[in-house]
């Protein structure tokens, strides 16, 4: 994202707007040029460009907060040096909240909305999660080496990470660690030859939406009535519910050996999840940016009302 021309232009534009505002405030002139009269509109346009760059590049909003904090702090210093009370008051009003939000979001917690049903039945599409950013070490960017503390993911953690092939965050269940042998036989998972403990709960008939990709790469969807089996699964210190679709993904036993510094992840919706068994592959250690601790809201669509009946700690 930092090399995106749109992002670079928006940062330069926003900084220029701040400089023009400071210059106009210092002069205290009653004469206004075009830029002075329309500085709010111009700044808004550059702000929208910045948000657009974040959206198309799946960027981290924390970078914007960091840049905003630096700009507001520099303006505050300039205001103190020249003794201008308007600049001091205005820049302080921006710097304090932006910096506090940056620290909170970067080093403590970050909200994340689940975009798919890969973690059903426990977590569903539209759930907003609180991601603990320091679970696996402190760092400014979502990916990269932890700078201060380094704690490794544990079995059964609900992890949020950036897959190597796609800049969009994923949420999955951590199944295997570096060096582990993962084997799947009849949808039963074995780690280093030992089966992950599971207990049958019940069978349900549901309707699911399946995605299909044809030979030309076109993706289409189709609703299907299926029968699913629910299981209580216990892995590490976590106990959670998984879902298997009867008659889906029937295949020969599969086995993977996890390379050094990589992890194996799966969705709880075992037969309808893009994870380490399919296109995601092994996840590098540095690509984890947090553990999902809490569910604080569910908002299924823009025209739906959010609800809070499912709020609670994530297993």
Model-derived segments and their meaning:
Residues 1-29, 35, 71, 121-315:
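Soluble "head" domains of membrane/secretory-pathway proteins
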Residues 2-19, 31-81:
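Membrane-embedded alpha-helical segments of integral membrane proteins
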Residues 80-110:
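Internal/C-terminal transmembrane anchor helices
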Residues 18-22, 77, 103-104, 108, ...:
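Hydrophobic membrane-targeting signal helices
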């Amino acid at each position: 994202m930092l090399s995106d021309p749109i992002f670079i232009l928006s940062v330069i534009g926003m900084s220029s707007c701040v400089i023009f505002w400071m210059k106009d405030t210092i002069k205290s002139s009653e004469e206004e040029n075009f830029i002075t009269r329309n500085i709010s509109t111009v700044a808004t346009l550059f702000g929208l460009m910045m948000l657009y760059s974040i959206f198309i590049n799946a960027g981290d909003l924390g970078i914007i907060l960091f840049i905003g904090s630096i700009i507001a702090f520099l303006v505050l210093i300039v205001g103190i040096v020249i003794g201008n009370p308007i600049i001091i008051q205005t820049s302080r009003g921006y710097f304090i909240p932006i910096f506090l939000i940056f620290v909170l979001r970067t080093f403590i917690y970050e909200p994340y909305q689940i975009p798919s049903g890969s973690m059903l039945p426990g977590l569903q599409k539209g759930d907003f999660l609180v991601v603990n950013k320091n679970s696996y070490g402190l760092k400014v960017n979502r990916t990269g080496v932890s700078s201060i503390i380094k704690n490794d993911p544990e079995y059964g953690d609900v992890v949020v990470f950036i897959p190597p092939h796609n800049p969009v965050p994923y949420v999955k269940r951590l199944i295997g660690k570096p060096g582990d042998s993962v084997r799947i036989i009849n949808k039963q998972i074995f780690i280093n030859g030992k089966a992950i403990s599971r207990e049958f709960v019940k069978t349900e008939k549901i309707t699911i939406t399946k995605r299909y990709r044809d030979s030309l790469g076109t993706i289409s969807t189709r609703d299907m009535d299926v029968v699913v089996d629910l299981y209580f699964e216990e892995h590490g210190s976590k106990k959670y519910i998984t879902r298997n679709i009867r008659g889906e993904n029937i295949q020969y036993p599969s086995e993977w050996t996890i390379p050094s510094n990589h992890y194996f992840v799966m969705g709880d919706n075992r037969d309808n999840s893009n994870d380490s068994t399919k296109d995601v592959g092994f996840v590098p250690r540095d690509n984890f940016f947090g553990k999902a601790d809490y569910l604080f809201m569910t908002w299924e669509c823009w025209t739906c009302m959010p609800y809070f009946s499912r709020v609670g700690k994530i297993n």
